[in-house]
UniProtKB/Swiss-Prot annotation:
The gene is LAB5. [4Fe-4S] cluster 1 binds at C107, C112, C118, S352. Belongs to the radical SAM superfamily. Lipoyl synthase family. This is Lipoyl synthase, mitochondrial. It comes from Candida albicans (strain SC5314 / ATCC MYA-2876) (Yeast). NCBIfam families: lipA, PRK05481.1, PRK12928.1. [4Fe-4S] cluster 2 binds at C137, C141, C144. It is found in: Mitochondrion.
Length: 386
């Protein structure tokens, strides 16, 4: 059926004109579509190819959005959070070793802003925090960019050996091992971690080992296995204050459970240094942070670090506040006055940040040689962490 509008149009204009108008409209749409497709294709061609994804090179070609923000003078990221782009021979050597031995690092998986500094130092200073038990976590904390899955792949049985081999190559004096949570494993991965520590000590007994472990679903017998493995520093992160824990961490992680982990580690091996980390910028109050420090001192925690929460992607929690460097100085001084052995506090500090390793390494060496009491941080070293 011909519409009334069509009949009116034909009466007013000759057929040839209508056809011309229709042709022009079609051509115009075609040009716009072609232009859009051309722009899209051009942008696509700038990125990695299919072969790059297959070979694993694509990850190195894609730029981190956080890095883009640091280079953008109009970005909202405060100036004190901007760091140089990672580069240098040492950086690429560490990266090469990590790839060859098929190891995961929290430096890459968690998009740590200090990767250039930690990987790019001199051989005796360069370090990578190795992430054990794979690169996929069974939990989903709202601040973390590590991949999640209810049933990750089985742990690599060669991982302890490969990790020990990589660390012995780097010639380090101090190394940090961390892990994803593995709630799918009966022991939470505790025995795998303990084996890794033992392998490292066999290959290089002089290396001091810090392990940043999980809570093993509250099974403190697993904490005991790890604490007795030969490690030197037992770390487990509270992440935030008690009131915000249910909103920030996975529901299976609780504030009191984390305190119990740190307490049991110290009870199992009193010579261990126990360590935890807090992120600021979630909206916590000063009173809440102060109470957290009291709770940590009550269970004998030796070391605490403070860092700025930085949103990894738009899917994660928003930053409530960018804490100024002066406030981090305040928390460092406050924690030291409360009796903590060592405190690292600054916007870019992370739980495995290397600025603290020099001091902790010195403490452990003095303990092993029974050289009197170890002075506190303010008297020992003053690392630059900004």
């Amino acid at each position: 059926m011909i519409s009334r509008n069509s009949i009116l149009l034909r009466r007013l204009y000759p057929t040839t004109i209508i056809r011309t108008l229709a042709t022009d409209a079609t051509e115009s749409t075609s040009v716009k579509t072609k232009r859009r497709r051309t722009i899209f294709t051009d942008e696509l061609n700038k990125g990695p190819s299919f072969d790059d994804f297959v070979s694993g090179k694509a990850k190195d070609m894609l730029e981190d959005p956080l890095e883009t923000a640091r280079k953008d003078p109009n970005a909202k990221l405060p100036s004190w959070l901007k760091v140089p782009i990672p580069k240098g021979k040492s950086f690429h050597n560490v990266k090469k070793d990590v790839r060859e031995l098929k190891l995961a690092t929290v430096c890459e998986e968690a998009k740590c802003p200090n990767i250039g500094e930690c990987w790019g130092g001199k051989k005796s200073e360069a370090t990578a925090t190795i992430m054990l038990l794979g690169d996929t976590c069974t939990r989903g904390c709202r601040f973390c960019s590590v991949k999640t899955n209810r049933k990750p792949a089985a742990p690599d049985p060669m991982e302890p050996e490969n990790t020990a081999e990589a660390i012995s190559r780097w010639g380090l004096g101090y190394v940090v091992l961390t892990t994803v949570d593995r709630d799918d494993l009966v022991d939470g991965g505790a025995r795998h971690l303990a084996e890794t520590v033992q392998k490292i000590k066999q290959k290089a007994p002089q290396i001091l080992v810090e392990v940043l472990g999980g809570d093993f679903r509250g099974d403190l017998s697993m904490v005991e296995i790890l604490a007795d493995s030969g490690l030197d520093v037992y770390a487990h992160n509270l992440e935030t204050v008690e009131a915000l824990t249910p909103h920030i961490r996975d529901r299976r992680a609780t504030y009191r459970q984390s305190l119990a982990v740190l307490e049991r580690a110290k009870q199992t091996n009193s010579s261990l240094i126990t360590k935890t980390s807090l992120m600021l910028g979630f909206g916590e109050t000063d009173d809440q942070v102060l109470q957290t420090l009291r709770d940590l001192r009550e269970i004998g925690c030796d070391v605490v670090t403070f860092g700025q929460y930085m949103r990894p992607t738009k899917r994660h929690m928003k930053v409530v506040e960018y804490i100024k460097p002066e406030k981090f100085d305040y928390w460092r001084d406050t924690a030291l006055d409360m009796g903590f052995l060592y405190v690292a506090s600054g916007p870019l500090v992370r739980s495995s940040y290397k600025a603290g390793e020099a001091f902790i390494e010195n403490v452990l060496k003095k303990r092993k040689h029974n050289v009197g009491e170890t002075p506190r941080l303010a008297q020992e070293i003053k690392p630059s962490i900004y």
